[in-house]
Amino acid sequence: MSAAPLCLIAAGGTGGHMFPAQSLAETLLAQGWRVKLSTDERGARYAGAFPAEVAREVVSSATTARGGALARLAVPFRIGAGVLAAIRAMRADRPAVVVGFGGYPTIPAMSAALVLRIPRMIHEQNGIMGRVNMAFARRVDRVACGTWPTRLPPGVQGIHTGNPVRQAVLDRAGAPYVPPGEGGLNLLVIGGSQGARVLSDMVPEAIAGLPDEMRTRLSVSHQARAEDAERVIAAYASAGISAVVRPFFDDVPQRLADCQLVISRAGASSIADITVIGRPAILIPYAAATGDHQTANARALAESGAGVVLPESVLDAESLRRDMRDILSDSARATAMAAAALTLARPDAAQRLADLVTELTR
């Protein structure tokens, strides 16, 4: 009896890279694959949620984007050491397929797969390809795209798989939407894994100026940085608004399913969650994101009517208040936005990725 095939998954050390990598790992394990995660020391700290059956391989990598002059000089040597280590590991236990999810920690594994001529693919979560995925886009067999359309290098064809989401999100996929009416109104404010200061600055002020009839019915769940939480709590309290403010919500899928409106950054994982559950959104793309990729991520929601996009360059409390008021006072519009979000969802994204992995073994 032959051993189960091995898929090596290479992912960087942020939630945006790790969530879809984890979803693919879980799907492949359920289909009888062996799975190994390749990352660097930073990425290994984010791998705790991966199934215990996933083997871990920590390799040396580095980026020129951070550190001083000496650290930058050491980058080629650290990457080179990582590539050699990855080649040795792959020769000892050769993967059938190598999948990269972006981020500099994927460089050693993707380079080793290229040298050893192992079938390989990348998954790009955002609407504008990151630097590492861009470097490998012409050197892989498949390019899977989480956001559509994705800006790709000339001559490269992408396959729209969507961005895999956590099981807790899938459990609430298409949950019935309760449109805003005369009862209570739930608002969810999320800004990525560490919150977003601009949302902590703007949202409480915007809500405080809403008509009394609407403001007094609001219940807010607001994800804020730990250092901002105290002042955000005080701002809501002074406006008489019921609010739960935390640095991290471990039940975001449930709060998303319960809300009438979500105000969010436009990270790929957040947008995937919003579309799979299906909720109206006000999106505020992170202006400093590489290549302005969050604006690209938000484009499909804006064009379909599922979301309103407010660039940071024009964001103020009044514009945010206006959009909140317009959505929460119009039940028909809010319902249509929720339905439009669902049309963009790819709840089977992990399976689509797994199918591409299997395809590469034939």
UniProtKB/Swiss-Prot annotation:
Residues binding UDP-N-acetyl-alpha-D-glucosamine: 14-16, 126, 166, 193, 294
Localization of this protein: Cell inner membrane
GO biological process: carbohydrate metabolic process; cell division; cell wall organization; lipid glycosylation; peptidoglycan biosynthetic process; regulation of cell shape
Entry keyword annotation includes Cell membrane: yes
Membrane topology reported for the UniProt record: Peripheral membrane protein
GO cellular component, one term: plasma membrane
Sample GO molecular function, one term: UDP-N-acetyl-D-glucosamine:N-acetylmuramoyl-L-alanyl-D-glutamyl-meso-2,6-diaminopimelyl-D-alanyl-D-alanine-diphosphoundecaprenol 4-beta-N-acetylglucosaminlytransferase activity
Top EC class, one word: transferase
Keyword terms: Cell cycle, Cell division, Cell inner membrane, Cell membrane, Cell shape, Cell wall biogenesis/degradation, Glycosyltransferase, Membrane, Peptidoglycan synthesis, Transferase
Pfam families given in the database record: Glyco_tran_28_C (PF04101), Glyco_transf_28 (PF03033)
Superkingdom to which the source organism belongs: Bacteria
Catalytic activity: di-trans,octa-cis-undecaprenyl diphospho-N-acetyl-alpha-D-muramoyl-L-alanyl-D-glutamyl-meso-2,6-diaminopimeloyl-D-alanyl-D-alanine + UDP-N-acetyl-alpha-D-glucosamine = di-trans,octa-cis-undecaprenyl diphospho-[N-acetyl-alpha-D-glucosaminyl-(1->4)]-N-acetyl-alpha-D-muramoyl-L-alanyl-D-glutamyl-meso-2,6-diaminopimeloyl-D-alanyl-D-alanine + UDP + H(+)
This protein's record includes keyword Nucleotide-binding: no
PANTHER family noted in UniProt: GLYCOSYLTRANSFERASE, UDP-N-ACETYLGLUCOSAMINE--N-ACETYLMURAMYL-(PENTAPEPTIDE) PYROPHOSPHORYL-UNDECAPRENOL N-ACETYLGLUCOSAMINE TRANSFERASE 1
Function, in words: Cell wall formation. Catalyzes the transfer of a GlcNAc subunit on undecaprenyl-pyrophosphoryl-MurNAc-pentapeptide (lipid intermediate I) to form undecaprenyl-pyrophosphoryl-MurNAc-(pentapeptide)GlcNAc (lipid intermediate II).
Family: Belongs to the glycosyltransferase 28 family. MurG subfamily.
UniProt-recorded name of the protein: UDP-N-acetylglucosamine--N-acetylmuramyl-(pentapeptide) pyrophosphoryl-undecaprenol N-acetylglucosamine transferase
